[in-house]
Amino acid sequence: EAGEECDCGSPANPCCDAATCKLRPGAQCAEGLCCDQCRFIKKGKICRRARGDNPDDRCTGQSADCPRNRFH
């Protein structure tokens, strides 16, 4: 939702302050296929295996999201 950096629904998430819905100090992310222990996974790590003619999807190192890498 607007103003939230992370989903504050679960107080058990070590990356997110449940009271403020903001990332804890030093955290880059709270969840996502390219987020591990509150940090972005390094560039090039496979986050989703290839299907059909599409190549493996890989983390960018700049986001917790796993981008879709598709042939055009």
From Swiss-Prot:
Role according to the record: Inhibits fibrinogen interaction with platelet. Acts by binding to alpha-IIb/beta-3 (ITGA2B/ITGB3) on the platelet surface and inhibits aggregation induced by ADP, thrombin, platelet-activating factor and collagen.
Annotated disulfide bonds: C6-C21, C8-C16, C15-C38, C29-C35, C34-C59, C47-C66
Keyword vocabulary terms for this entry: Cell adhesion impairing toxin, Disulfide bond, Hemostasis impairing toxin, Platelet aggregation inhibiting toxin, Secreted, Toxin
Molecular function GO terms recorded: toxin activity
InterPro entries xrefs: Disintegrin_CS (IPR018358), Disintegrin_dom (IPR001762), Disintegrin_dom_sf (IPR036436)
Residues spanned by motif Cell attachment site: 51-53
Tissues/organs with expression: Expressed by the venom gland.
Disordered as annotated region, ranges: 51-72
Extra information: The disintegrin belongs to the medium disintegrin subfamily.
Pfam families for the chain: Disintegrin (PF00200)
Originating species: Crotalus cerberus (Arizona black rattlesnake)
Descriptive protein name: Disintegrin cereberin
Family annotation (PROSITE patterns): DISINTEGRIN_1, DISINTEGRIN_2
Taxonomic superkingdom: Eukaryota
GO cellular component: extracellular region; plasma membrane
Occurrences of domain Disintegrin (ranges): 1-72
Assembly and binders: Monomer (disintegrin).
Localization per Swiss-Prot or TrEMBL: Secreted
Annotated family: Belongs to the venom metalloproteinase (M12B) family. P-II subfamily. P-IIa sub-subfamily.
Annotated transmembrane regions: none
